[in-house]
């Protein structure tokens, strides 16, 4: 007999640094999920990844207080900032430019994010990444 799902929870946690402090502790604690068990499992699963990389995670918790989690790719904005070598996007995206990014770099990001995006092909994924770049104030070149 399959376990009965009590709900799902979406969090964004930095790779290798899950700990019971907010926002993780309160979010899991109020649902009765074992916080330390999640932190240990998440840190073990992300130990090969770059430390501090934000990882979206979907936690499915069951009525017997057990849980499973699925990790996704980091957000597009993380990849864009890393590729363009900027700390943050522009505060006024239509007017001031924060940096520039090439079509080749956009293609690399789109290929990495393809399974998380709802795009039919790589061109659709590239268009989504390009839109994110423009909304961050990055200039798309080449």
Swiss-Prot record:
Gene3D superfamilies: Ribosomal protein L11, C-terminal domain (1.10.10.250), Ribosomal protein L11/L12, N-terminal domain (3.30.1550.10)
Gene Ontology process terms (BP): translation
Molecular function (Gene Ontology), one example: large ribosomal subunit rRNA binding
Amino-acid biosynthesis found in the keyword field: no
Modification after translation, per record: One or more lysine residues are methylated.
SMART domains (UniProt xref): RL11
InterPro entries: Ribosomal_uL11 (IPR000911), Ribosomal_uL11_bac-typ (IPR006519), Ribosomal_uL11_C (IPR020783), Ribosomal_uL11_C_sf (IPR036769), Ribosomal_uL11_N (IPR020784), Ribosomal_uL11_N_sf (IPR036796)
One Pfam family this sequence matches: Ribosomal_L11
Disulfide bond residue pairs: none
Keywords: Methylation, Ribonucleoprotein, Ribosomal protein, RNA-binding, rRNA-binding
UniProt record similarity statement: Belongs to the universal ribosomal protein uL11 family.
Role description: Forms part of the ribosomal stalk which helps the ribosome interact with GTP-bound translation factors.
Subunit structure: Part of the ribosomal stalk of the 50S ribosomal subunit. Interacts with L10 and the large rRNA to form the base of the stalk. L10 forms an elongated spine to which L12 dimers bind in a sequential fashion forming a multimeric L10(L12)X complex.
Protein name per UniProt: Large ribosomal subunit protein uL11
Lineage of the species this protein comes from: Bacteria, Pseudomonadati, Pseudomonadota, Alphaproteobacteria, Hyphomicrobiales
């Amino acid at each position: 007999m399959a376990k009965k799902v009590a709900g799902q929870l979406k969090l964004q946690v930095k790779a290798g640094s899950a700990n019971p402090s907010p926002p993780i502790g309160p979010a899991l604690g109020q649902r009765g999920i074992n916080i330390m068990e999640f932190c240990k499992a998440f840190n073990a699963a992300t130990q090969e990844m770059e430390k501090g990389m934000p990882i979206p995670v979907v936690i499915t918790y069951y009525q017997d207080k057990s849980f499973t989690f699925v990790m996704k790719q980091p957000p597009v904005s993380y990849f864009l900032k890393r590729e363009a070598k900027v700390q943050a996007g522009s505060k006024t995206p239509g007017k001031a430019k924060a940096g520039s990014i090439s079509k080749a770099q956009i293609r690399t990001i789109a290929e990495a994010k393809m399974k998380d995006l709802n795009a039919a092909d790589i061109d659709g994924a590239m268009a989504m990444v390009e839109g994110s770049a423009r909304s961050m104030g990055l200039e798309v070149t080449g």
